[in-house]
Each structure stands twice: as C-alpha cells, then as structure tokens.
Amino acid sequence: MKIENSNILVIGGAGFIGSFVVTELLKHPVNKVVVYDNLARGKVSYLSEQMKDERCSFYPFGGDIREIDILNTAMQGVDYVISLAAMWLLHCKDYPRTAFDVNIAGTFNILEACVNNNIKKLIW
C-alpha cells in the first residue's frame, strides 16, 4: 500500500491505539489524516501533538459509525480507511443491543461507505 500523498480516514483515531496509528501515519508524506471519533472512549488529549501537524485534523461533523450519512460524507475524497472503532468488550456484556449497533451494524456501515466512496483499501 503506497500512502504517499494520500488522504486517510482513521476511525477511532482518538483512542489509545488509534492515536499511535495517527502518529505513525504522520511520519510518512501523506496528504492528510482525518480522525473520525465519537470520543466515547477516545480523548482529544491523546492527539495533542499530532494536531500540531497541519496534515492532521478531526472530522468536524461527527464521528459515530452508526450515522451512515455522516460517515459517507467523511469518506469523500479519502483514499484509505483505517478502522479501530469498537465498543469496549466489558460493556458489550452489559449493553448487548448497543454492542450490536456499534460493533455489527456500525462495521457494516463502514463497509458500505467504503464501497460507496471507492475507498482503495480498508484496514481493520
């Protein structure tokens, strides 16, 4: 996968692991890295250093993978999508319906949005 001059959407990019993925992407000559995160578990503070790079930004209109229309818009002009979004495993037991909505339906939304936007590659 050649990421030079590409636009990359990192879903769940404000999470602990996602923030490290963003850091690694910015070490390469990418055009831009957009973080799509609902901040349910992620933290803006995880990306404080990365946001100093003009190529890095938060998607300004939301970050929930259950919102297919917003997700579709976020993927416009994107080359690659990296998805790290998921509901925390211990919460899945306590909130099974929400777990289904996020982990199953949300993942389907990501797949559908990737197809709709001709994404070159989804990494998840």
Role assignments for model-derived ranges:
Residues 10-11, 83, 122-124:
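Structural signature of the Rossmann-like NAD(P)-dependent dehydrogenase/reductase core
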Residues 67, 80, 106-109, 121:
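Conserved cofactor-binding/catalytic machinery of classical short-chain dehydrogenase/reductase
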Residues 30-42:
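Conserved glycine-rich Rossmann-like NAD(P)H-binding loop of the short-chain dehydrogenase/reductase
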Residues 7, 31-32, 120-121:
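Residues at the starts of beta-strands that form the adenosine-phosphate
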Residues 8-28:
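N-terminal Rossmann NAD(P)H-binding glycine-rich loop of SDR-like oxidoreductase domains
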Residues 62-102:
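NAD(P)H-binding glycine-rich loop region in Rossmannoid oxidoreductase-like domains
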Residues 4, 109-124:
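Conserved Rossmann-fold NAD(P)-dependent oxidoreductase catalytic core, especially the SDR/UDP-sugar
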